[in-house]
A protein has these predicted regions:
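Helix-loop boundary and gating motifs at the non-cytosolic
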Residues: 4-54, 203-206, 217-231, 238-241
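Intrinsic disorder in cytosolic terminal tails and internal cytosolic loops
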Residues: 1-6, 186-193, 317, 376-409
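A late C-terminal transmembrane helix in Major Facilitator Superfamily
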Residues: 323-351
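Intracellular juxtamembrane helix-capping segments at the cytosolic ends
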Residues: 113-126, 305-320
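C-terminal membrane-cytosol helix-exit motif in multi-pass small-molecule transporters
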Residues: 153-154, 168-188, 369-378
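Helix-to-loop junctions at the C-terminal end of transmembrane segments
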Residues: 60-72, 157, 252-264, 351
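Structural signature of the two symmetry-related core transmembrane helices
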Residues: 75-89, 168, 267-282
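Paired small-residue
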Residues: 98-106, 291-299
Length: 409
C-alpha cells in the first residue's frame, strides 16, 4: 500500500460525506431558482431569496467555529445537518417569500458550518507531504459531486416535487459516514477579525479577483438557472448546462494552474476575465440554440471558476514574510462570499428589465478585471508561489489546509 493510500483510507469516510453533501447542496442550490421561476415569482424576489443563502454563509464563517468548539465536531455536524435537512423539507411544504428567505439563510449557515467541520478534519489527518494531494482529491470530489447533483434535476416530472426530499436524504446519508468516523477532533482557533480595506491595500488585485470571482460563481449557481428558464423554460436544459459548465470548471483547474505558474497570475487573471467577457457576448448573440449554449457553458466554466484561486495565488506571491498570510487568505474568502452575496441581488434586479443583462454584467466585470489586472505590477518568477486548486465552495478551514501556509512558518 502506497503512502498516499495510507493517508486517504483513514479519511475515506470524510470524502463520502463530502460527496453526498455536495450532491444534495448542488441540486438544491440550482433547483431553488427553477422552482421559484415555475411559481412565477419575480426575478427581484428570487435574487433576494438566493442572496440569503450567501448571507448565511458569510455569518457562518464568523460564528460557526465558536459553536463547533463548544459542542464538538460530531454533535455540531449532526446539528448543522439537521438544520439543513429541516430547511430543505420546509421548502417543499409552503411558499412564502419571507419564509423562504429565512430558510435559505439557514441553509447557507448550516452548509458552511458543515464544510468547516469536514475541512478541519481533513486538515487534522493530513501531513504537509500529502496535503496538496488530498486537497486535489477534495477538489475533484466536490466538483464531480456538485455536477452529479445537477443531473438529478433532470428526473421524471412526476418526481420533481420530491427534489427537496431527495436533497434531504443525501444530506442525511452524509451524517452516517460522519457518525462512523474515528478521527481525533481538531482544536479550532477562535475567529479573528480582519479588515477588507487593509487587505485591499496590501493585495488589491487578489481582493478584486476574489470579489469578482465570487460574483461570477454566485451568479452562476443562483441566477443563470433563472435566465435559462426564461429563455428555454426547460429543466433539462438547466440541468445539462450546469453539469457541462461545472465539468469545464474542473478540467480547467490544473492547466490554468500550470500556465499561471509559468506566465504569472496577473496575466492569467486577465486572460480568464477576457474569456469570460467574450463568452458572455456570445450568449447575447448566439443563445438561441441549445447546443451552442452548452458549448458556451463549458467555455464559461473554464474561466469563472479559476479567477478566485488565481487571486489567492497572487496574494501568496506578493506577500512579505512579515505579513499574516492566514488573515489575508481568510479575508479573501470573506470577500469572495460578499461577491457571491451581491450577485443574485444585482442580477435579479437587472434581469427584471431584460434577461440579457446577466451576461452584460458578466462582460463588463470581465473587461474591468482584465484591464485592472494588466495595470498591476508583474511578479518575478522567483517569487511565484505554487498554484493550489480550490473548490468552487469552501469553508474557512480550507485556508489552513492550503500547503502554501507551511512555507511561511
Amino acid at each position: 500500500m502506497s503512502k498516499i493510500q495510507q493517508s486517504i483510507l483513514p479519511i475515506s469516510s470524510l470524502f463520502f460525506a463530502i460527496s453526498f453533501l455536495a450532491i444534495g447542496y448542488g441540486m438544491i442550490l440550482t433547483y431553488v431558482g427553477i422552482y421559484l421561476k415555475e411559481l412565477d415569482v419575480s426575478n427581484i424576489t428570487i435574487g433576494i431569496i438566493n442572496a440569503s443563502f450567501f448571507l448565511g454563509a458569510i455569518l457562518s464563517s464568523i460564528l460557526s467555529q465558536s459553536i463547533i468548539s463548544k459542542v464538538g465536531h460530531i454533535r455540531s455536524f449532526a446539528a448543522f445537518a439537521s438544520i439543513m435537512v429541516s430547511s430543505f423539507l420546509l421548502h417543499s411544504i409552503y411558499y412564502d417569500q419571507y419564509l423562504w428567505g429565512f430558510l435559505r439563510f439557514l441553509s447557507g449557515f448550516s452548509f458552511y458550518g458543515l464544510l468547516i467541520i469536514l475541512e478541519s478534519w481533513l486538515n487534522e489527518k493530513s501531513d504537509s507531504a500529502d496535503r496538496g494531494k488530498i486537497l486535489a482529491i477534495y477538489t475533484i470530489i466536490f466538483y464531480l459531486s456538485t455536477a452529479i447533483g445537477q443531473l438529478l434535476l433532470n428526473i421524471n416530472e412526476k418526481f420533481t416535487q420530491s427534489i427537496f426530499t431527495i436533497g434531504s436524504i443525501l444530506v442525511l446519508i452524509s451524517i452516517i459516514f460522519i457518525s462512523l468516523t474515528k478521527i481525533k477532533e481538531p482544536i479550532l482557533e477562535p475567529f479573528e477579525k480582519f479588515s477588507i480595506p487593509k487587505i485591499y491595500s496590501v493585495v488589491p488585485l487578489a481582493a478584486t479577483s476574489s470579489l469578482i470571482g465570487g460574483f461570477f460563481v454566485g451568479g452562476f449557481f443562483t441566477m443563470i438557472p433563472v435566465y435559462l428558464m426564461i429563455e428555454f423554460n426547460s429543466v433539462e436544459v438547466v440541468s445539462y448546462f450546469m453539469l457541462i459548465t461545472l465539468l469545464g470548471g474542473l478540467l480547467s483547474q490544473w492547466p490554468i494552474g500550470l500556465l499561471s505558474d509559468k506566465y504569472g497570475r496577473r496575466r492569467l487573471i486577465a486572460y480568464c476575465a477576457q474569456s469570460t467577457t467574450f463568452v458572455s457576448l456570445f450568449f447575447l448573440f448566439f443563445s438561441f440554440n441549445t447546443t451552442m449554449v452548452y458549448i458556451f457553458g463549458f467555455l464559461l466554466g473554464l474561466t469563472i471558476f479559476s479567477i478566485y484561486p488565481l487571486g489567492v495565488a497572487r496574494a501568496n506571491d506578493v506577500m512579505d514574510e512579515n505579513k499574516d498570510i492566514l488573515e489575508i487568505s481568510r479575508t479573501l474568502l470573506f470577500t469572495y462570499g460578499i461577491g457571491s452575496f451581491i450577485a443574485p441581488l444585482v442580477i435579479g434586479f437587472s434581469i427584471s428589465f431584460n434577461s440579457n443583462f446577466l451576461f452584460i454584467i458578466f462582460a463588463i466585470l470581465g473587461i474591468y478585471l482584465s484591464f485592472y489586472s494588466l495595470s498591476k505590477k508583474r511578479i518575478d518568477d522567483d517569487d511565484l508561489s505554487t498554484f493550489i486548486n480550490i473548490p468552487v465552495t469552501s469553508g474557512t478551514k480550507l485556508i489552513d489546509f492550503d500547503p502554501r501556509q507551511e512555507e511561511t512558518t
